[in-house]
Amino acid sequence: MGIRRIGLVVPSSNVTVETEMPALLSRHPGAEFSFHSTRMRMHTVSPEGLAAMNAQRERCVLEIADAAPEVILYACLVAVMVGGPGEHHRVESAVAEQLATGGSQALVRSSAGALVEGLRALDAQRVALVTPYMRPLAEKVVAYLEAEGFTISDWRALEVADNTEVGCIPGEQVMAAARSLDLSEVDALVISCCVQMPSLPLVETAEREFGIPVLSAATAGAYSILRSLDLPVAVPGAGRLLRQDSAVTAS
């Protein structure tokens, strides 16, 4: 089968997804992966900064296509969700169309679409969120997920505008925000609604503490990549979402 080649389109100041995604998929029992990134300039997570970043998408898609990936993940969740309900479908379709014009058959996923996909895979209706965003952007994320049919029971915005600083948010701060949520009637917790906010070491710990499925933008992205490649979803130590097919691979 060979090494599965994954393309990542990331904000220039994002370093976490390029750390957490390889760490996750390196645990897969049946496949090897390589990761190849292209970058869109962005430092401040604001409507203006996100719009300027999204304007660079076509250039980045052309560049990443040269690496001939099997799957491309558009790895900035809020940049898609600020576009309004259903934007992940439009972005994924536009990128796929651009790739096809250039002769690439790469599959296309987005962090925004992957989170929706992951929550549905967990059959979650009532959801709680921890986001790093300023409150107005966090409200757009909440509205986006509610438009997808989820009930956002409670949420927290850590209100960090500098994207480099988002990548340095301590795990203790993320867990403190999660503990402040009302999780009494929640089906799932998104402990990091952002691929730049580090959370991979927290997912299993939070699942044990809270007794509910816990996922992140990174684990949802890994789930979507594996499903797109028709690979078993069996990644240990990363939460219930990535154990969907563990019994199958064990047998």
UniProtKB/Swiss-Prot annotation:
Residues found modified as S-(2-succinyl)cysteine: C76
Looking up HAMAP family in the UniProt record yields: Maleate_isomerase
Q: What is its EC number?
A: 5.2.1.1
Task: Indicate the impact reported for Y133F.
Answer: No change in catalytic efficiency
Where does this protein come from, organism-wise?
Answer: Nocardia farcinica (strain IFM 10152)
**Similarity section:** Belongs to the maleate isomerase family.
Gene for this chain? maiA
Q: Additional info? A: Reaction is initiated by nucleophilic attack of cysteine at the double bond, yielding a covalent succinylcysteine-like intermediate.
- What's the impact of mutating C76S? Reduces catalytic activity by more than 1000-fold. No change in substrate affinity
Q: Fill in the subunit field for this protein.
A: Homodimer.
Give the protein name, as stated in the record: Maleate isomerase
Q: Check the record and name the InterPro entries matching this protein.
A: Iso_Racemase_Enz_sf, MaiA/AMDase, Maleate_isomerase
User: Which molecular-function annotations from GO does this UniProt entry contain?
Assistant: maleate isomerase activity
Residues annotated as the enzyme's active site: C76, C194
What is the role of the protein in this entry? Catalyzes cis-trans isomerization of the C2-C3 double bond in maleate to yield fumarate. Shows a strict specificity for maleate, with no activity detected toward structurally related substrates including citraconate, mesaconate, dimethylmaleate, and maleamide.
Q: Which residues bind substrate?
A: N14, C76, L77, V78, Y133, N163, V195, Q196
Q: Which domain of life is it from?
A: Bacteria
> What catalytic reaction does the record list?
maleate = fumarate
Identify the taxonomic lineage of the organism of origin. Answer: Bacteria, Bacillati, Actinomycetota, Actinomycetes, Mycobacteriales
